[in-house]
């Protein structure tokens, strides 16, 4: 039978509940346990697919096509377990399910209410499909006290009573701020947060306390006394240099031991931390460094590129170098010469995005990389802009553009109206809904055996995750290839271009999919490892 760990947050948002959940899962895995992590998001959107990246950050896509919270990316990277549609739920999805049931008459005329119908739907989500796991970690989004989170907190309170005794543990993540004028850390915000949680009916078993400096023993005793938890269960969560230091830091503080003790597991299996120690060693002892320019649209909020950032660092791990990121807003190149920004970097990456803003700047970045022989990695939108650049400057199609930007006589990039998903034909219309209507999830691609990208993968058959509505127009394939842009990867039916590259360029690859979503610290994605390797070579030339 699975044991359940419920992780809540208090005082302020963005404390790192997702990282805490992922780190704890990694520690339990290191002891040989099978672990699943689930995220419960209180917002009313059905999923984050249509939320602005500036508000929500990255949309993480799973193999089965779910558009989910970016925390699921942390879960995958820390545990290696692929997430799926059933690992993320939102208030919007819960209400949609309930309304559909009510319309069908499933409630037999009952008045549909938050309690029991909404809370029951949440509990069903938490409990479903956990037969193969020893531990299920549930992160509750938001902060204790938020009105949106109340049904979720009530649901996990009920589960604490309904689950067999000793199979549910509550962890509360809080902040202990340092007040410079007083010269001390303050416990009062944590005390009030726990008081709020207890008023709902949840008594935390463990306090995970974020702080920017060591918490004195006297303050831990104070928290233990006023929050009614064991002193050993007041765990300090100090700031660390990288997120990959968190599992080791939490293990040293005894978080995993305290969780197992709360479940009555004694003696517990000893953890094997060698993998995490190796990653930490490589991160803190690089043998060199490279600089990658990320020419994007949402550079003001790095969370919009969370998986991309981590995948680049994984590429650095594979090559034992530090990867420095130079963030450049693509619009800058529409009014300024790209050369001063790009001459000293060792690689250029143009990530995914939507809309016309910044597109011309990304096209100019691709042009600079092609002409100056600088390693270029175009992902999704970045591949599309590279193809438009080639069409304009190599093929001579001056009006080459994307139908995403409006009507055009030369739609080198156009809206996909149909594609195969397994044996099913998926269809879309330009006037259709935005939510959940893209080409989403893992799809197969076939690579040319003699291509650079096939050599990098070591295979001609790959499966990668997609999230896009627009695709390079196959009608332009022959002219682009004649100009030197090789369509090295296609969908199995030969209709959708998946990868492009230049044979006469040291490293210029565009991919329609999102390889960053499948990169792990222990298994860096081969494209990112190869891209950073090419950047190292470029660093010797600059």
From Swiss-Prot:
One of its GO terms (molecular function) is metal ion binding. Mg(2+) binds at residues 71, 139. It comes from the Bacteria. CTP binds at residues 13, 146-148, 186-191, 222. It holds the Pfam family CTP_synth_N. GO terms for biological process: 'de novo' CTP biosynthetic process; pyrimidine nucleobase biosynthetic process. GO terms for cellular component: cytosol. SUPFAM superfamilies: Class I glutamine amidotransferase-like (SSF52317), P-loop containing nucleoside triphosphate hydrolases (SSF52540). CTPSs have evolved a hybrid strategy for distinguishing between UTP and CTP. The overlapping regions of the product feedback inhibitory and substrate sites recognize a common feature in both compounds, the triphosphate moiety. To differentiate isosteric substrate and product pyrimidine rings, an additional pocket far from the expected kinase/ligase catalytic site, specifically recognizes the cytosine and ribose portions of the product inhibitor. Belongs to the CTP synthase family. PANTHER family: CTP SYNTHASE (PTHR11550), CTP SYNTHASE-RELATED (PTHR11550:SF0). This is CTP synthase.
């Amino acid at each position: 039978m699975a044991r359940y760990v419920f992780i809540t947050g208090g005082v302020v948002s963005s404390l790192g509940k997702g990282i805490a959940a992922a780190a704890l899962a990694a520690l339990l895995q290191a002891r040989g346990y099978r672990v699943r992590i689930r995220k419960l998001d209180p917002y009313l959107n059905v999923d984050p697919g249509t939320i602005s990246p500036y508000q929500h950050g990255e949309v993480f896509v799973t193999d089965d096509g779910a558009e989910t919270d970016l925390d699921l990316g942390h879960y995958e990277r820390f545990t290696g377990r692929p997430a799926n549609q059933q690992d993320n739920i939102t208030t919007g999805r819960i209400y949609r399910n309930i309304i559909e049931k009510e319309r069908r008459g499933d409630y037999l005329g009952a008045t549909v209410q938050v309690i029991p119908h909404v809370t029951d739907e949440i509990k069903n989500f938490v409990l479903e499909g956990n037969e193969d796991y020893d531990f299920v970690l549930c992160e509750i989004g938001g902060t204790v006290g938020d009105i949106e989170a109340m049904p979720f907190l009530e649901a996990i309170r009920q589960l604490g009573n309904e689950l067999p005794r000793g199979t549910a543990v509550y962890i509360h993540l809080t902040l202990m701020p340092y007040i410079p004028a007083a010269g001390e850390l303050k416990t009062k915000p944590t005390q009030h947060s726990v008081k709020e949680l207890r008023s709902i009916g949840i008594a935390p078993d463990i306090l995970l306390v974020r702080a920017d400096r060591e918490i004195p023993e006297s303050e831990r005793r104070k928290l233990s006394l006023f929050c009614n938890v064991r002193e050993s269960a007041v765990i300090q969560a100090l700031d660390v240099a990288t997120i990959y230091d968190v599992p080791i830091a939490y293990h040293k503080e005894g978080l995993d031991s305290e969780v197992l003790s709360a479940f009555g597991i004694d003696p517990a299996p000893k953890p094997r931390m060698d993998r995490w120690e190796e990653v930490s060693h490589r991160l803190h002892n690089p043998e060199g460094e490279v600089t990658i320019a990320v020419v994007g649209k949402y550079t003001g909020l790095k969370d919009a590129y969370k998986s991309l950032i981590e995948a680049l660092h994984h590429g650095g791990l594979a090559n034992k170098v530090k990867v420095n990121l130079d963030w450049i807003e693509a619009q800058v190149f529409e009014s300024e010469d790209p050369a001063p920004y790009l001459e000293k970097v060792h690689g250029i990456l143009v990530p995914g995005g939507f809309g016309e803003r910044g597109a011309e700047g990304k096209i100019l970045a691709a042009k600079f990389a092609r002409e100056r022989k600088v390693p270029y990695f175009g992902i999704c939108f970045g591949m599309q802009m590279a193809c438009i650049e080639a069409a304009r400057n190599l093929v001579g199609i001056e009006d080459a553009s994307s139908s995403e930007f409006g009507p055009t006589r030369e739609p080198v990039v156009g809206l996909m109206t149909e594609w195969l998903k397994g044996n099913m034909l998926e269809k879309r219309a330009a006037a259709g809904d935005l939510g959940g209507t893209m080409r989403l999830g893992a799809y197969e691609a076939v690579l040319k055996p003699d291509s650079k990208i096939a050599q990098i993968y070591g295979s001609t058959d790959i499966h990668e995750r997609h999230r896009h509505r627009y695709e390079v127009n196959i009608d332009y394939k022959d002219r682009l290839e004649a100009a030197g842009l090789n369509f090295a990867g296609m969908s199995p039916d030969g209709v959708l271009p998946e990868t492009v590259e230049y044979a006469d360029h040291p490293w210029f690859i565009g991919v329609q999919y999102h390889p960053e979503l499948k990169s792990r610290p222990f298994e860096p994605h081969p494209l990112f490892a190869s891209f950073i390797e090419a950047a190292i070579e470029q660093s010797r030339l600059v």
